[in-house]
């Protein structure tokens, strides 16, 4: 999908996008990616089980829990800004809506996973899958915003 976005011509805009949007979408990609890596580390090392039981690997779990705040706030900001521009730029609004829906689903599944202490494996896998979908959506959004915001380079004739 990202390759297809890169090959398509940039979408036309009635108004330019805010100058800060490419940087903000990039920050969202980086924070969600970092959070996904921490989540993968928690799952692969069974850090939650070891922390709840033997009080080992608690630092890994705590870093993942602390990372929820910045990743959620940046993704929420990107989704909200994109959704608010829906009348001017419909594709941006649709992607913003997808980000917000996936973010709400991710937080809900994450809370349920934590409350059940990662004992329900399909729920843990769903948490990882929704995180990957959120990351992919943010990557596509970032690519489109960056391509759309590029100013044409003046040529000397």
Predicted regions and their residues:
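Polytopic transmembrane helical bundles with strong interfacial aromatic enrichment
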Residues: 1-157
